[in-house]
């Protein structure tokens, strides 16, 4: 779940990364700064998927309640209904532990909206097997929409390739805005060698990413 100055997105990784308390700190700060209105904190659904995010109950008054941290309706809940079944890969997600990281990455943070890749038929994601056949990227929902335009020329890409250790890469995008289609192609191009030539598995370091 991320905020922007104009709307609230629906994604639950913030709660998974920071835990309920730090997530509520972020939400509280965003509300107090006037960057998110309470009428935006309603259940939101990602079109074409079964993912629904719930943040604050609609009966919350305009003034920020002191009970925000104890409300039974946690403001960072995520409901995922796996209607079609499928594998679930457990992941160990990085959490900011130091006071400086919590201040810089939570209290003072202003996250950008998450970027979803919804393919043909409303399926969430694009398979690697079809990544370099241009048809899947042509059928991406909103493929021509701009994604990154933050004045940055590169982004960090963190990859969990089960059961190997987590890998981190720097992906250079240039200084122009990048469309969702171009971003998908760049990500797959960067990962191509990793998928086709995975590292040897060291049993001593086998872990959940």
Regions found by a protein language model. Name each.
Residues 2-172:
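Intrinsically disordered, low-complexity regulatory segments of eukaryotic
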Residues 144-209:
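Positively charged alpha-helical interaction cores common to chromatin-/nucleic-acid-associated regulators
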